[in-house]
């Protein structure tokens, strides 16, 4: 959302912007706010240790309710497929505000995979006034759900807006370890995994695959910014700890992580955002999931689904690291996710008067 916030702030004659954050993924949130110099007007700070999805839902709704009652916004915007995005749409509906869904229309077709994100998307679609799908495929998904053409704005993905801005900037790391990693001339396998459906044995298999890949290629270093979740670390530690060419590092702020993506040779991830970012940087992506709501990258040839099967992950990584033609075919494929102007299209659409009728 950062590019959208900044674009709206550049149009004070049209928009009085207030920014609310839930505090979900606190460390990552603070990093992005700092990188884009955004100061929230409201911080719900909803997260407590060990809370359930139901508690996240109710705490988010309780936090947003008085804000919307006091501010009486014309529009509420939220991005993505989190529970808090669905709650923002529901709160906007309760308060008679129009809701704009950024990154709308992503689908896997299975309401429980990913859980709860797919259902969050479906419910948010029903509540939204205006839909901003990032790709033609996601726009088609909305139309298949009965959403009218007049409330669909094909925007591109704001993730790419943010990525291209950061990637173009020079960066001098202050962390000696990060500086060492970025200066290492060897090929880098960048690994990120955190998704709920991969916790436990599936994530353990990913770890085994990473170790086998590194053992097979003496010129490859694996860099793993591992998630703070103890379940993630418990699953990965047996395979990834104590290897001289596997670097387990703390979660990175947004800007240094983009620099790691730029430095990498190959990326193995279960992250939706990384699936979108990597193709714009010319980096092949192996997707450690059984399904993806971002099939555009698969169709374009920038990404390949490998699931969490150790043998398949190793085989595909080996192919790309051994075959220059196979690697080049993925690295040169055109990114389907946007051109860096999504925020402008979203702001333009919001300037047009619209009714509050749900579609």
Regions found by a protein language model. Give the residues of each.
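A donor-sugar binding/catalytic signature common to diverse glycosyltransferases
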Residues: 78-79, 101, 131, 257-298
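Donor-nucleotide binding loops and adjacent catalytic segments primarily
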Residues: 13-14, 25, 30-32, 51, ...
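A nucleotide-sugar donor-handling region in carbohydrate enzymes
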Residues: 20-27, 127-201, 205, 306, ...
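A short, histidine- and acid-enriched strand-loop-helix "catalytic/donor-clamping" loop
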Residues: 101-115, 129
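Membrane-proximal helix-turn-helix segments that form the acceptor-binding/catalytic region
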Residues: 117-130
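Conserved nucleotide-sugar phosphate-binding/catalytic loop shared by glycosyltransferases and other
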Residues: 13-59, 63
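C-terminal amphipathic helix plus adjacent low-complexity
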Residues: 322-359
């Amino acid at each position: 959302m950062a590019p959208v916030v900044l674009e709206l702030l550049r149009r004070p004659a049209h928009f009085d912007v207030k920014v609310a954050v839930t505090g979900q993924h606190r460390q990552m949130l603070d990093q992005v706010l700092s990188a884009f110099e955004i100061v929230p007007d409201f911080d719900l700070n909803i997260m407590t240790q060990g809370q359930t999805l139901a508690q996240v839902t109710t705490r988010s709704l309780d936090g947003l309710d008085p804000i919307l009652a006091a501010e009486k916004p014309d529009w509420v915007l939220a991005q993505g497929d989190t529970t808090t995005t669905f709650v923002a749409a529901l709160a906007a509906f309760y308060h008679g505000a129009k809701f704009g869904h950024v990154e709308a229309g992503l689908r896997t077709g299975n309401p429980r995979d990913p859980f709860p994100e797919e259902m969050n998307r479906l419910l948010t679609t029903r509540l939204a006034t205006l839909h901003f799908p990032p790709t033609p495929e996601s726009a088609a998904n909305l139309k298949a759900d009965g959403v009218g053409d007049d409330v669909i704005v094909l925007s591109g993905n704001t993730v790419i807006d943010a990525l291209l801005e950061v990637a173009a900037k020079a960066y001098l790391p202050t962390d000696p370890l990060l500086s060492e990693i970025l200066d290492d001339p060897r090929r880098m396998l960048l690994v990120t995994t955190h998704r709920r459906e991969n916790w436990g044995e599936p994530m353990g298999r990913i770890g085994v695959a990473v170790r086998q890949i590194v053992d097979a290629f003496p010129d490859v270093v694996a860099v793993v910014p591992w998630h703070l979740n103890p379940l993630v670390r418990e699953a990965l530690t047996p395979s990834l700890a104590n290897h001289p060419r596997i670097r387990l590092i703390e979660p990175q702020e947004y800007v240094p992580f983009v620099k790691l993506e730029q430095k990498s040779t190959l990326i193995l991830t279960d992250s939706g955002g990384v699936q979108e970012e990597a193709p714009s940087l010319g980096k092949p992506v192996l997707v450690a999931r059984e399904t993806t709501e971002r099939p555009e990258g698969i169709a374009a040839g920038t990404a390949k689904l490998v699931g969490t099967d150790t043998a398949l992950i190793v085989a595909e990584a080996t192919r790309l690291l051994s075959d220059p033609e196979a690697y080049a075919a993925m690295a040169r494929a055109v990114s389907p996710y946007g051109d860096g102007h999504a925020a402008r299209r979203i702001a333009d659409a919001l300037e047009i008067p619209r009714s509050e009728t749900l579609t």
